Amino acid sequence: MNESFDKDFSNHTPMMQQYLKLKAQHPEILLFYRMGDFYELFYDDAKRASQLLDISLTKRGASAGEPIPMAGIPHHAVENYLAKLVNQGESVAICEQIGDPATSKGPVERKVVRIVTPGTISDEALLQERQDNLLAAIWQDGKGYGYATLDISSGRFRLSEPADRETMAAELQRTNPAELLYAEDFAEMALIEGRRGLRRRPLWEFEIDTARQQLNLQFGTRDLVGFGVENASRGLCAAGCLLQYVKDTQRTSLPHIRSITMERQQDSIIMDAATRRNLEITQNLAGGVENTLAAVLDCTVTPMGSRMLKRWLHMPVRNTDILRERQQTIGALQDTVSELQPVLRQVGDLERILARLALRTARPRDLARMRHAFQQLPELHAQLETVDSAPVQALRKKMGDFAELRDLLERAIIDAPPVLVRDGGVIAPGYHEELDEWRALADGATDYLDCLEIRERERTGLDTLKVGYNAVHGYYIQISRGQSHLAPINYVRRQTLKNAERYIIPELKEYEDKVLTSKGKALALEKQLYDELFDLLLPHLADLQQSANALAELDVLVNLAERAWTLNYTCPTFTDKPGIRITEGRHPVVEQVLNEPFIANPLNLSPQRRMLIITGPNMGGKSTYMRQTALIALLAYIGSYVPAQNVEIGPIDRIFTRVGAADDLASGRSTFMVEMTETANILHNATENSLVLMDEIGRGTSTYDGLSLAWACAENLANKIKALTLFATHYFELTQLPEKMEGVANVHLDALEHGDTIAFMHSVQDGAASKSYGLAVAALAGVPKEVIKRARQKLRELESISPNAAATQVDGTQMSLLAAPEEASPAVEALENLDPDSLTPRQALEWIYRLKSLV
């Protein structure tokens, strides 16, 4: 049967009718249909689930005359299966039994209680703890894009309005949403194709009036002026759709989503998608996390601190007041790192616990962890109180104390609660008198049964008699088969076993009813008290979220203080003067993976020295030198200390990199096309305050096409845009640029060649390189000796053709580098055919005269 169901379900059994009606409401996602201790899937859902989860596909009888494909998973293992599905971009509707089987006529009443989607998960089992999990929505009109993101596990709600396609692509790269909502008429599908968790939504969900109404209702406001987003119509369209989707899937109130923030380009350093990829900030070029900037810098001790640090790295701020405050805090905290980090480690992931509290899905162990976090606050306050720093004291104030809530949770929750409240044993003894009474009644069963067993043995004289309990038959008196014929007349047989008989007596049955009632009453009351705890905690949610944010920021700053001390970083100085001056700068990642000391290098960029033409051998360190400059600037603009002896840095609005390239086969773009697209983006968007890294421009095409493009790009950047530029090249003709224009200088990375070997010095020197050492590098790479020999031969031949051809033809027509050598003269031909060993002295003399006549 296909899932495009006919609306007439009358041919099906009542249970399948109920299932099909629920499934018709959620046709595009999997439906987990609760039946007893299992969640069942039927028809096409069962087939898909069996493939996605590698579970058995079976059949369940027949309905409407056809066998029903079925697959099932145990309810206690549902989180593991949900995690697998979410990681594959699937969404699941969870359908629970809400009716009482004992009183239901026909199928037990069921309804979908929540929808689990990749972008709306909050359960810790489904989340990557050190990575944000974002739901996003994108909207487009003739003026640009609207983009909104929400981290439901923290309540962080952001919107932006990228003006063009490149900026929008950069935002998608930066935020990397787990789920992306888009309008059904979205025109730029190429922009989002291939992304995980794509969800097509109807146009009406993006209506601006509906969006304003939804957002005002959520925040309890009359307008959005206070959030600074009133006029961001494109962003609001996206935000409205996103909020509607969250409400549809969560089916509960969202008190932790209390505000929305506008992210403006002018507030942060802009990095496009290529730059984020090339700088390997949180992901390396192979898609992993090893040997990235975050891998070196992130030694935070809480998951929420780790997530905040990654947000900082992907969004460096331009406000130097904020940056200087962070620098001051890092300096002030350096002496207390070893005391603070062990305490902070105990705080855990308070941010996500609070989100689950707001959604009323927090489990007993979440509340125990919250209590443990509160218990660390007095120690943190005591340690920070002595730190002489206004920013530190401001953070300490935001952390709060929450002594009353700590006391409440200490009284209410036992030390090591079970996973689920339905298992009982969550509320601590002494917290509620009535609960203690019901528990005492239930727990007193053991003493009563021991007394009953002793009494009945003495009364009957049956030494094999014992009293027991099982979940199926309840309490019983058991007598061995050999003595069962001696059972008293008031013993009513309940169960026959191979070697024994089990009985019940009125007294035991009466006690059983009493105990089971007390257990049920205790569990029901415990669940009620647990829910009341939420009601007591939620009024403090805003203060708790502020505290969690302050603790995460403290973790980040303490971590940066530790990294600065451990890795020998220094505090950079911000200046209003354009430029970057670095003394003994180092690459933060490369220096950690090298087995030998890293060679530190200087850099000086200023209005009088805007562009460096960087030459030198392959493997000499040109790309490392360029990237380390960008990473030092990036670290400075998150407020961190930097890997250098001294850094003075002026205003930077954007960082661009044109470093390396590969075919983009999915989009049908060659390596050269990718290179030129990235170059065009730089030339259109760079400003005099931009930091631009250009590596080997033009190498993807013919020599003189490439040289001409590289020359023109360098001219444009130096003369028109006047950006701060590092321009690495193997075109030695470009080393003439400093002679032709102001603000351009040559530097090179040194190497020493000895015979057929080469030693890279990795040190930056003024002036142009003398040669490229390409053949020496090829020999190091293991290219066969005969190939290297032939290459040297061809190199000499090419150099003899026109050693200065390139310099004289930069603006001229392209000359063939592999032109055929000139015809040999008759004298040369005669010599080639001559065998000197076969000549007599007289013949040799004659040949000399003959050759002279041929010259």
Curated annotation (Swiss-Prot):
**Does the keyword Cell membrane belong to this entry?**
no
SMART domains in alphabetical order: MUTSac, MUTSd
Q: Which superkingdom heads the taxonomic lineage of this protein's source?
A: Bacteria
List, alphabetically, the InterPro entries matched.
DNA_mismatch_repair_MutS, DNA_mismatch_repair_MutS-lik_N, DNA_mismatch_repair_MutS/MSH, DNA_mismatch_repair_MutS_C, DNA_mismatch_repair_MutS_clamp, DNA_mismatch_repair_MutS_core, DNA_mismatch_repair_MutS_N, DNA_mismatch_repair_MutS_sf
Residues annotated as coiled-coil are none
GO CC annotations, alphabetized: cytosol
Q: Where is the signal peptide?
A: none
Which positions bind ATP?
G616, P617, N618, M619, G620, G621, K622, S623
Q: Which GO terms describe its biological process?
A: mismatch repair
UniProt entry keywords in alphabetical sequence: ATP-binding, DNA damage, DNA repair, DNA-binding, Nucleotide-binding
Q: What does this protein do?
A: This protein is involved in the repair of mismatches in DNA. It is possible that it carries out the mismatch recognition step. This protein has a weak ATPase activity.
Q: Under what name is this protein listed?
A: DNA mismatch repair protein MutS
Lineage of producing organism: Bacteria, Pseudomonadati, Pseudomonadota, Gammaproteobacteria, Enterobacterales
